[in-house]
């Protein structure tokens, strides 16, 4: 698939978020640009880290490919060096789908879970993707009442999320990394199929070194734990991308 990158990037983005910009290629496809911006606390903390966009595009592409190889349908089409991805155009469902294998982050702030302890089973959590309301947690009734998804779609989304977890947990385990938790977004294509969309990167996952439990994700930036790009590079290296 040949695309004229420079011409596409001259267009006004369809969407420009905290760390990515999305450009239309045609009626069915978009170009996702992974920028070097890094944020935490819903954008309250912000910096620009050279090389982050490249690493996230590279890692996301690899993980989308792994999902596709294991029967999980995604919006991913192709990686374009250095920081771009071609993807199917989808309508994003405004629900953040979070899967947790180990207690960490907000789960420990909100509930009496012990930080770092393995959960008895993967917990699937839905949050309303809405900055104005602070991305509150959803239950099924609220999601349906708000018209975000049907009950059938929510059941399917949970099924997809658990399959994503199964694939990625195994992949990272083989690379000496613990998949603590992650969030994904789900989009609908023209036919109404549910596809894993957005990105899957150290921006959207918690990853710990299996032996040392060193943090290899955006918590390094959130908590000022050191050089976040160096940690992202470790993830890319373990995945055989560098």
From Swiss-Prot:
SUPFAM superfamilies: SAICAR synthase-like. The keyword Repressor does not apply. Its EC number is 6.3.2.6. One of its GO terms (biological process) is cobalamin biosynthetic process. GO terms for molecular function: ATP binding; phosphoribosylaminoimidazolesuccinocarboxamide synthase activity. It is an enzyme of class 6 (ligase). Keywords: ATP-binding, Ligase, Nucleotide-binding, Purine biosynthesis. It catalyses: 5-amino-1-(5-phospho-D-ribosyl)imidazole-4-carboxylate + L-aspartate + ATP = (2S)-2-[5-amino-1-(5-phospho-beta-D-ribosyl)imidazole-4-carboxamido]succinate + ADP + phosphate + 2 H(+). Pathway: Purine metabolism; IMP biosynthesis via de novo pathway; 5-amino-1-(5-phospho-D-ribosyl)imidazole-4-carboxamide from 5-amino-1-(5-phospho-D-ribosyl)imidazole-4-carboxylate: step 1/2. The keyword Cell inner membrane does not apply. HAMAP family: SAICAR_synth (MF_00137). Belongs to the SAICAR synthetase family. NCBIfam families: purC. This is Phosphoribosylaminoimidazole-succinocarboxamide synthase. It comes from Methanocaldococcus jannaschii (strain ATCC 43067 / DSM 2661 / JAL-1 / JCM 10045 / NBRC 100440).
């Amino acid at each position: 698939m040949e695309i004229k990158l420079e011409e596409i990037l001259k267009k006004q983005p369809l969407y420009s978020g905290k760390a990515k910009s999305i450009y239309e290629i045609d009626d069915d496809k978009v170009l996702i640009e992974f920028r070097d911006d890094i944020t935490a606390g819903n954008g309250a903390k912000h910096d620009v880290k050279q090389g982050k966009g490249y690493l996230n595009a590279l890692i996301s592409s690899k993980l989308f490919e792994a999902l596709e190889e294991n029967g999980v349908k995604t919006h991913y089409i192709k990686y374009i060096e250095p920081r771009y991805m071609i993807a199917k155009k989808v309508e994003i469902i405004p629900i953040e789908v979070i899967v947790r294998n180990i207690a960490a982050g907000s789960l420990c702030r909100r509930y009496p879970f012990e930080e770092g302890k393995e959960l008895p089973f993967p917990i699937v959590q839905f949050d309303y993707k809405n900055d104005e309301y602070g991305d509150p947690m959803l239950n099924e009734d609220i999601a349906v009442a708000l018209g975000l998804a049907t009950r059938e779609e929510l059941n399917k989304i949970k099924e997809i999320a658990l399959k994503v977890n199964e694939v990625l947990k195994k992949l990272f385990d083989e690379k000496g990394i613990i998949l603590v938790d992650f969030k994904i977004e789900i989009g609908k294509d023209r036919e109404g199929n549910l596809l894993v969309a957005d990105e899957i990167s150290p921006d959207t996952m918690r990853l710990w070194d299996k032996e040392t439990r060193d943090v290899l994700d955006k918590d390094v930036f959130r908590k000022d734990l050191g050089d976040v790009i160096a940690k992202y590079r470790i993830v890319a290296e373990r995945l055989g991308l560098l």
